[in-house]
Amino acid sequence: MAYIQLEPLNEGFLSRISDLLLCRWTCRHCCQKCYESSCCQSSEDEVEILGPFPAQTPPWLMASRSSDKDGDSVHTASEVPLTPRTNSPDGRRSSSDTSKSTYSLTRRISSLESRRPSSPLIDIKPIEFGVLSAKKEPIQPSVLRRTYTPDDYFRKFEPHLYSLDPNSDDVDSLTDEEILSKYQLGMLHFSTQYDLLHNHLTVRVIEARDLPPPISHDGSRQDMAHSNPYVKICLLPDQKNSKQTGVKRKTQKPVFEERYTFEIPFLEAQRRTLLLTVVDFDKFSRHCVIGKVSVPLCEVDLVKGGHWWKALIPSSQNEVELGELLLSLNYLPSAGRLNVDVIRAKQLLQTDVSQGSDPFVKIQLVHGLKLVKTKKTSFLRGTIDPFYNESFSFKVPQEELENASLVFTVFGHNMKSSNDFIGRIVIGQYSSGPSESNHWRRMLNTHRTAVEQWHSLRSRAECDRVSPASLEVT
């Protein structure tokens, strides 16, 4: 409730003037509240006059209230009539005035929040929001075309794929001693160290011990008592940029002591897996994989480095790769010339135990099933990653291009006997694989433009089986 208090003064004429001004100022606010109450149809019991009890309601307030209730007119604060006080004949106030009475006007607005007065001139109607011409339709669930059963979801489930073989052990859960006793493939000693200053990883292959006796798949191996081991190093998943140690002749306890560096950022090195594969070299037979060791580099403190003895485990790769060859092909229709660039090779199969390899490439043009021309590169001594950058040109008319084939054969130069075969590919009409066919097709679609591509070398038997052109060359 709001309280408005009137306190008249009893100081003669000045007090009467002050009292009048105070009443006028108070009545402005009082009448404003009365106006708001009258608009809301307030009842009589909402206005109470409190003062020193007993007290009578002033006549001017009674007149204002009765005029508001009748609705004859609405008075502002300045239009409210003031009833003068009745004085005694001697000019003094009555006993009720001289008692310094305090009049308080109490105004209670009980429903101000719930009932807001509307303007007498503007009638604001509530705005209704809605979507015009909206149709209400009942939503019906869609009917399934067929009834599904749990068997429909699990009909492709094959339980035999998830059955456990009690005889197979998880290699990761076995210790090195358990792996060694189970597979008996020997152990490998190596170390790693990362150089933060130069951003490269150094892998040191130290030695191996207790390697198993050699295995001959075709019966052509002469020495079945000793192995000729070497180690291939790569950072998975990249197996192309691998390193290879030298071959140690006739020993089951080879000592390598060789270091290899991989240029790789530190964060990238932590995502790689170091793979070391021990291979048995045989000049007259294919090279056999003895075993492997894999180390996730995220589990190793590369900066601090460390040494490990790890037991070799069997590898799913029984044969080593023969190497890769980078070639460029370009055909000039106006001149009828087929240009071939032998750029480089990498990770070629080693053909000499002591000196590595002296590789060279022989290029032979076959038209249909007839050998037409033979050319070859120079040989590079003691390397398995040769750089050639040699160009060759063959006369091939445009009408004969579709029937042409190029046979690329990598040999290891041998002055004492016949050259050692390393690998072969065929590009052209009788390509030896999808990669070779794709290279030839790209060259035919882009004349006068050199097209480069890496190719993985294949064995002689594989090329002879899929390409008739391979049978026409030596």
Swiss-Prot record:
GO CC, alphabetical: exocytic vesicle; plasma membrane
GO molecular function terms attached to this record: calcium ion binding; calcium-dependent phospholipid binding; clathrin binding; phosphatidylserine binding; SNARE binding
Classification via SMART domains: C2
Keyword Iron-sulfur: no
PROSITE patterns in UniProt: C2
Keywords: Differentiation, Membrane, Phosphoprotein, Repeat
Subcellular localization: Membrane
One Pfam family from the record: C2
Bias-annotated ranges (Low complexity): 96-112
Residue span(s) of domain C2: 184-310, 321-455
PANTHER family linked: SYNAPTOTAGMIN, SYNAPTOTAGMIN-17
Job of this protein: Plays a role in dendrite formation by melanocytes.
Family: Belongs to the synaptotagmin family.
Name of the featured protein: Synaptotagmin-17
Organism whose genome encodes this protein: Pongo abelii
Record gene name: SYT17
